[in-house]
Amino acid sequence: MYRAGALVLRSATLRRTRFLAAHQNFATISSQRSSVLLAKSLESSIGGAGNQKKFYSSKDHDDPIAVDDSLELYKDLGGMSPIQVPADMPNVPILAINRYPLFPGFIKKVDIVKDDNLKALIRRQLSLKQPYAGVFVKKDDENKEETIVSLSEVYPTGSFVQIIEVRDQGSVLELVLSAHRRIRVIEPIEDVVAPKTDTPLNGRRARGKRAGLPPTPPPTPPLSTPTSAPEASATSPEEKEEKKDPERKGIVMVRTENVVADPVPKNNETKATMMAIVQTIRDVVQFNQLFGQQINLLLHPSQNVIDNPVYLCDLVATLVQSAETKDLQEMMDETDVSKRLKIALLLIQKEKAVAKLKHDINKDVEKKVQDHHRKYLLNEQLKVIKKELGIEKDEKTTIIEKIDERMKTLAVPEYALKVINEEKTKLQFLDPHSSEFSVTRNYLEWLTSVPWGLTSPENRRLSHAKKALDEGHYGMKDVKERIMEFIAVNLLRKSVGGKILCFHGPPGVGKTSIAKSIANALNREYFRFSVGGMTDVAEIKGHRRTYVGAMPGKMIQCMKKVKTENPLVLIDEVDKIGGAGFHGDPASALLELLDPEQNANFNDHFLDVPVDLSRVLFICTANEISKIPGPLRDRMEMIDVSGYLAEEKVAIAHQHLIPQLRKETSLSADQLNIEDSALEELIKHYCRESGVRNLQQHIERIFRKAALQIAEQQPEDEQPAATTAISENSDAEPVSTPSDPPTFTPEKINISTENLQKFVGRPKFTSDRMYEVTPPGVIMGLAWTAMGGSALYIETVLKRPVDVTSDKDGSIETTGNLGDVMKESVRTALTVSKGILAREQPDNKFFDKSHIHIHVPEGATPKDGPSAGVTLVSSLLSLALNRPVVQDMAMTGEISLTGKVLPVGGIREKIIAARRVGAKRVFLPAENRRDFDDLPEFMKSELDIRFVSHYDELYEHLFQ
């Protein structure tokens, strides 16, 4: 492909230098030495300041031509001696170029890289003393091929050029072309190698040379005519193959004809157009002073350039940089010189507009740069003056004074003070513009942002704390008692201490919000951060200072924000912390933070100085404590935050949820009323979860729909609108003030069980229990989940009728997404059931030959744990005896292999579930009596609780 390098005449400034230097010489010398002076115009590009050779013409030895020594002139060109350009040479090689045409009288550098056939043709032409070619512009600028396959790919009018310089590097052939005249392509012809003939020394050309006659033009290559047999036989096999597939072979040789311009009319219009062109060129030069002198010399009347309209048009086409290819080609194609002058005038005027715009832009940019530079110099001078007068200090002194001012209010320990002083000394010797200066300054700011020795006064009044806790949350007896105990201990110690508590329970019961109330009750600063999904240890312990953008961990950020050493820090979702990975184990990093024996000297990676966190009250929240790592769980004081009963939810709705929503929606009790029966229906059939978050969302939906109804009842002309108050000052902005309230009184909306479905949709839970009457083999158990308690039915049936005559033993199958522990409970329950049945009814061989299937409904929910042991035994015995158990009964408890009933957890949640499904009698392990006694009285009412220590006691209640 052709590579238009730095010598390409279209390239900005270098290209203009060659053109103008060439045409300045053209105006003053004879036409016989035109080729030599054209080569001289390339002196700035191919001459250089290095080693040069000097070539002389045969007539004038005082006119040296400087040529770069690195350029290897083709040997057969005869050392740059002048060659008479033939007036008519129809068959020439074709060179297809991109973007800009090459106009007569100008020079262009072209590289041939890919096409070997074209390179071979050019070398052959040079060896035949025919350094000529035709240059045509490709219509598609994106076409990077060096040859064309069709003449339709190029514009028909081009230039006849002479190859004045050659540098053959083997793979690349560099050509310097000088255009002489316009030509038009007619048709492609085949490239046929002419046979070489030896020219005798006494031939006509040699005699003419000795006689001093001008050399005759070399013979033209043969045309594409049918060759004779000897010539055809001389064709190589490779050329025959190329002729077989002409579509793949590019066109390298064409037949052309000279383009003769029409006579130039000598009238005033032509002269005026030329003068306008010359004046516009002078205007363009004003915006680019680099070539102003050369252009002015070239356009001087003594040079006769302005008297040659053809040359003037070509000069314009070479000078313009913003013109499109089709516009330049239009000038190349035009034979009417008058029209060509008009095209040239239009192009140079467009170039003038673009040049003026570029000049204005550059001028504006230069002005802005100068203004900025001037302001910078003035500011620097002002800084120096202020520094000399003592008005302003340098950056280092300002930073150090700021740090010293901070430290006056801090009780910095000795080890931290030593580090601060070392960093201050280091800062004084650093360059303010260095990266180390920024790192040191940032480190000092963080060191002095830690509230060393600062504590906030803590509330020690129990009455104030109790009032603050009761106002924010209903119930939560265990949490409130523990906080009161904490205040009492600090009161007796007369000091501020820390503790690590963990609130665990189902979602929506107020674990996170109670922490804010505790902070208000204790008068401590509050800071919260969540560790759910955290996988990077640096979030807790900070980054090393060697990293770009390093920062301390969450605890140091907390200390900087709260500005006290005794805040309340809530670590939310501690059971969902990420596991060990590429960035460490965050759960293990919390061990040092939450260990009372270690957090007095907590070491952050960024500060690298021990910080005392022993006065911080840490409160963690979790849904499932089983997911908290054991060592971390061991460092916390676990407090169970159980779910709410229906009565508690109603009280929370009246005391907290509804008043808050009235304030947010501006709906008073006169506009919207929710009956207690509607709340109970809402809790029973829509919001059965342990928390109140879903209940809050449903009540919000009721308030929104009520607000919409009230807004629709209000007439549009009575809707409140904002009035605009304009002050006497006309320049003041208008201020919007609310107008008088409307006189419209909306109809009161009352929410009851009858219209509740209209506001919140259909009930989610339509029945309290799966079975109203349980058949044999079906027992209702009680289960604990992270969402609270729930009823868990155990269904046991026969897979097929019992065949007492079969030799095969019975089998048991379990379904319902059971875990390994629960599957073991099934096998244990089967063994216990066989023992009880053999003792109570020795003749009953039900379990020996039966194929039993045990299923636990809601198979999509994973189920595991040992607390369903007594329920499984009861279900198996009910099926074996074919006797249903007592209705409205529920049970829970782990069974041992000998029939002993072991204690289980989640008694509060299970009692709540039993009350929700309407159970009247509940069987609990005897060892869980203490857990039941801790429940409030209203929760224990209306339930018949039976405590059993062995399954025999339960058997008597169920089947006897």
UniProtKB/Swiss-Prot annotation:
GO terms for cellular component: mitochondrial matrix. SUPFAM superfamilies: P-loop containing nucleoside triphosphate hydrolases, PUA domain-like, Ribosomal protein S5 domain 2-like. Disulfide bonds: none annotated. PROSITE patterns: LON_N, LON_PROTEOLYTIC, LON_SER. Residues 214-224 have a biased composition (Pro residues). This is Lon protease homolog, mitochondrial. The keyword Transit peptide applies. Residues 225-236 have a biased composition (Low complexity). Its EC number is 3.4.21.53. Homohexamer or homoheptamer. Organized in a ring with a central cavity. It holds the Pfam family LON_substr_bdg. Keywords: ATP-binding, DNA-binding, Hydrolase, Mitochondrion, Nucleotide-binding, Protease, Serine protease, Transit peptide. InterPro entries: AAA+_ATPase (IPR003593), ATPase_AAA_core (IPR003959), Lon_bac/euk-typ (IPR004815), Lon_lid (IPR054594), Lon_proteolytic (IPR008269), Lon_Prtase (IPR027065), Lon_prtase_N (IPR003111), Lon_prtase_N_sf (IPR046336). Residues 773-960 form the Lon proteolytic domain. Residues 237-250 have a biased composition (Basic and acidic residues). Residues 92-352 form the Lon N-terminal domain. It catalyses: Hydrolysis of proteins in presence of ATP. It is found in: Mitochondrion matrix. It comes from the Eukaryota. Its main location: mitochondrion. GO terms for molecular function: ATP binding; ATP hydrolysis activity; ATP-dependent peptidase activity; sequence-specific DNA binding; serine-type endopeptidase activity; single-stranded DNA binding. Residues 1-56 form a transit peptide. It comes from Caenorhabditis briggsae. ATP binds at G505, P506, P507, G508, V509, G510, K511, T512. Belongs to the peptidase S16 family. GO terms for biological process: cellular response to oxidative stress; chaperone-mediated protein complex assembly; mitochondrion organization; oxidation-dependent protein catabolic process; protein quality control for misfolded or incompletely synthesized proteins. The active site is at S867, K910.
